[in-house]
Amino acid sequence: MSVTMRQMLEAGVHFGHQTRFWNPKMAPYIFGQRNKIHIVNLEHTLVMFRDALDYARRLAANKETILFVGTKRQARDIVKEEAIRCGAPYVNQRWLGGMLTNFKTIRQSIKRLQDMEKMVQDGTLNKLVKKEALDFQRELEKLNASLGGIKEMKGLPDAMFVIDVGYQKGTIIEANKLGIPVVGVVDTNHNPAGIQYVIPGNDDSSQAIRLYARAMADAILEGRNQAIQEIVEIGKTDSEVLSGQDLSADA
C-alpha cells in the first residue's frame, strides 16, 4: 500500500491538538493553525511516513520482527486486527512495566499462559472443581489480555511501531534503553525525541490510526512477499544454470 496525501486528508491526519498544548519540538512539522488547533504539514508527514514504511519492508524482508503497540481505547482493536493480519506481535491492552527490559521474567508468564492453554485443549480444565475452574479462567483471561499478542515472540523485537508516543511513554523508555528502533505516530503535543522514525500526525482519530496501522501491516506483508519472490527467482536461476550445464554435457 502506497500512502497518498488524499488518504491522509480523508483520515484527518493533519488535525493536531489545541495550540496551547503544543510541544515546540514539533514546530518543524506544523503547517499553521486553524480555530486554535494546530495543522500538521502533510507534505512532511507523507515523506516521513513512506520512509517508515520502507524501513518496515526492509525488516520484514530480512525476517525481522516489528512489535505493534497501541493501548489507548481508539487504537486497541485496530492494532490487534492489523497485527494479526500481518502476523506481527502486538500489545493492545496495558503495557506491563519491564515487558522489554525484563523480558526473561515476562517469558515465564508467557510459558504459564501457554501451559494453561494446553490444559484447556487437553481437557484438564474440565477435571477441576467449579471454584478452581473459575479462578483458572480468570487467570487465563488476564494473562491473555496482557500477553496474548506476544506469546509467539521468541525474543526482543527488532523494532517497534507505536501509536501515540505520549500515551506509551514507558514503552519508548524501555525501547530506547535497549536500543530498539521505534516507528512512532507523534501528535503536535508530544516530544519526537527518542523516536527513530517519526510519523507526525493525529493520534486520536480512529480513521487516522487505522490508516497508519493498515499501511504498516501492508508494508510488512510486502516485505515478506518480496523475500519469497527473491528466493523463487534464485531457484529459477539455479535451475536454468543446471539445465544449461546438462545440455552442454549432452552435446
UniProtKB/Swiss-Prot annotation:
Record's CDD domains?
Answer: RPS2 (cd01425)
Keyword annotations from UniProtKB, A to Z: Ribonucleoprotein, Ribosomal protein
Q: What is this protein called?
A: Small ribosomal subunit protein uS2
Source taxonomy: Bacteria, Pseudomonadati, Pseudomonadota, Betaproteobacteria, Nitrosomonadales
What Gene3D superfamilies does this protein's entry cite? Glucose-6-phosphate isomerase like protein, domain 1, Helix hairpin bin
Domain of life, per the record? Bacteria
Q: Name one GO molecular function term.
A: structural constituent of ribosome
Give the protein family. Belongs to the universal ribosomal protein uS2 family.
Pfam families xref list: Ribosomal_S2
One biological-process term from Gene Ontology?
Answer: translation
UniProt-listed SUPFAM superfamilies: Ribosomal protein S2
This entry carries the following GO cellular component terms, namely: cytosolic small ribosomal subunit
Q: Which InterPro entries does its entry note?
A: Ribosomal_uS2, Ribosomal_uS2_bac/mit/plastid, Ribosomal_uS2_CS, Ribosomal_uS2_flav_dom_sf
